[in-house]
């Protein structure tokens, strides 16, 4: 009978540790925007249609976005 329990024991895996709860962010943790510049307005309709900004709007936005790894990080 001990051989039976030995075989069963090798298949049982330990439970992974419980995941840490993510802290909820509330208004008191968020400060005022710094260096904010309103470039243009894109309505929810354009975003829902999946349209990409084009022409002057795209160039204006591209000139303001910080670059990461030599590429534009947002556009």
UniProtKB/Swiss-Prot annotation:
GO biological-process terms attached to the record: midbrain-hindbrain boundary morphogenesis; regulation of cell shape; regulation of Rho protein signal transduction
KW Manganese (keyword) present: no
Chief localisation class: cytoplasm
Every CRIB domain range: 30-43
PROSITE patterns named in the record: CRIB (PS50108)
Listed Pfam families: PBD
Coiled-coil ranges per UniProt: none
A cellular component annotation (GO) from this entry: plasma membrane
Record region (Disordered): 45-75
Compartment(s) where it occurs, according to its Swiss-Prot or TrEMBL record: Cytoplasm, Cytoskeleton; Cell membrane
GO-annotated molecular function: small GTPase binding
Keywords: Cell membrane, Cell shape, Cytoplasm, Cytoskeleton, Lipoprotein, Membrane, Palmitate
Keyword Nucleotidyltransferase included in the entry's annotation: no
Membrane topology recorded in Swiss-Prot or TrEMBL: Lipid-anchor
Family: Belongs to the CDC42SE/SPEC family.
Protein name (record): CDC42 small effector protein 1
Natural source organism: Danio rerio
